[in-house]
Regions:
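Short intrinsically disordered terminal tails
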Residues: 1-4, 23, 52, 96-102
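Tandem-repeat/low-complexity and Cys-motif detector
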Residues: 2, 28-37, 80-89
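Amphipathic alpha-helical interaction modules
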Residues: 16-66
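A generic structural signal for ordered secondary structure
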Residues: 2, 35-39, 68, 72-75
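Amphipathic alpha-helical binding modules
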Residues: 66-102
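Extreme N-terminal leader/activation tails
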Residues: 1-23
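Intrinsically disordered and other compositionally biased segments
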Residues: 8, 13-15, 46, 62-63, ...
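Generic structural signal for well-ordered, non-transmembrane alpha-helical segments
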Residues: 11, 35-43, 85-92, 96
Length: 102
């Protein structure tokens, strides 16, 4: 898969699936945090892919997902644990899309 194409698909996912809702102030705090972390996760996945551009994108996203899962398991901080679990969920979504593109 072409890395530029993969990155554009992932950025489109961010804009479509995790776009900031227009009613920010009427949402529950946890929903707002989830959406914010999800958008951040997409950005981190893109950075990770750019750093590992010679690697297969599917393998790179699997490695990213494993890495954040390890972070979630090792942290004792509840807020950080929530963030890493969101990153894991988003990486799983991205991985599903990439596998579907094969």
């Amino acid at each position: 898969m072409n890395m530029k194409y993969v990155l554009s698909v992932i950025n489109n996912l961010r804009d479509e699936w995790y776009k900031p809702p227009s009613c920010y102030y009427h949402r529950k705090r946890i929903e707002f945090e989830y959406q914010s972390y999800a958008r951040s996760a997409i950005d981190e996945i893109c950075f990770y892919l750019m750093e590992h551009e010679n690697e297969n994108p599917i393998t790179a996203v699997e490695n990213f997902r494993h890495m954040v899962d390890c972070f979630a398991c090792e942290t004792k901080n509840g807020d950080a644990n929530f963030m890493f679990s969101v990153y894991y969920d988003v990486a799983s979504d991205v991985l599903d899309v990439l596998l579907g593109m094969q």
